Amino acid sequence: MTSSTLSARLRGRLEERRPDGLFRQIEARAAQTGLIDLSNNDYLRLARNPALIKAARESLDVWGASSSASPLVSGYTEGHRALEERLAHWAGFRWGLVWNSGYAANHGVLSVLPSKGDLILIDRLAHYSMIAGALRSGARVQRFRHNDVEQLEHLLVRSERWAQVFVVTESVYSMDGDRSDLQSIAALKERFGFTWILDEAHALGWYGARGSGLAEEEGVTDAIDVFVGTLGKALGSMGAFTLFHQSCFREFLINFAGEFIYSTYLPPSCAAAALAAVNWVEAQSEERVYGHKLSAYFRERLPGSPPGDSPIVPVIFGEAVPMLRAAQTLAIAGFKVASIRPPTVPAGKSRLRISLNTALAEDDLDRLVAALEDIFR
């Protein structure tokens, strides 16, 4: 195969996506768009918080713009260590490890902790980074029906022949905004003794008395073996982290996870901003109360919206083309929303993903509901 025949093959594959509205492009976002942004994950609007910006600037003065090395060489700084310790204390764990991204953290954890002879039971709607890591591990991977604790129990009953069993779930799912039944999974762990890996990416900042997530709110922190969180959503910075009760998990990942080892480390300024965000979130419980109030207000007024209290509200269209038209109509009305289509979601489940945030007012949501009702008329 020559480069020209490869180019033809690539173009052909791309053209196959256009008729169904599945061809994707990236658009450079302007600093000022005039739109109310309901597409990103900055749920507490911390990305522009003065405390985070101040912390990042002070770190830039000390460390410069880059960590300049991988963490095992010299990229791991006092700032990264301080963030790990703060995150662990905040969420009720003993040990922490900072990663460059949520994808790297999930993929790194799931590709090296399980191995051949082990079984991974993973929720069917778990993030792609978790599924990809699990498939790379060499372990047997079985996906159970979304949020189906009964099926999970059935699979656990039949899991005795495996050396180790891992259960992998999220606390709040990114496309539907629904919650896992963490207490029921914790009860299963007490019976079966599996290793539980929980991704709290979309729950951080929104749940818990201290804002550390749904595990805190549900009182199941002690049952979790690996807690995965992100610094780039509600915490308004960049990167991710994993938390553990046992130091051997941290040490093993430092030694065996290529995603951690073979890359220039997260800039210290991002770690500093994240540390400031944790301090802010823990002190500002009223923001979480207001966020939940907004979620309830919007769901009550939007016909057909799913029950829940997370900041994520899907509006299902089914096919991609009408969903893309609806997104354009909402932009004209002053709202930027995320257009989600296969393969991110299953075929026939294309949707607008509306991400609420605490900078919104009820009047904003009233206008959004009116615009959506016009679309569906």
Predicted segments, located by residue:
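N-terminal "arm"/small-domain region of PLP-dependent enzymes with the aminotransferase-like
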Residues: T2-A65, F194
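Conserved PLP-binding catalytic core of the aspartate aminotransferase-like
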Residues: L46-A47, V289-G334, T344, G348-K349, ...
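PLP-dependent enzyme catalytic core of the Aspartate aminotransferase-like
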Residues: P50, K54, E58, V62, ...
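Conserved N-terminal alpha-helix of the aminotransferase class I/II PLP-enzyme fold
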Residues: K54, S59-S101
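Substrate-binding/gating loop at the entrance of the active-site cleft, primarily
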Residues: N100-Y103, L121-S137
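Conserved PLP-anchoring active-site segment centered on the Schiff-base-forming lysine
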Residues: V109-Y128, V149
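Active-site phosphate-binding strand-loop segment of PLP-dependent enzymes
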Residues: Q142, H146-L198
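Active-site C-terminal subdomain of aminotransferase-like
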Residues: F192-T195, H202, Y207-D309
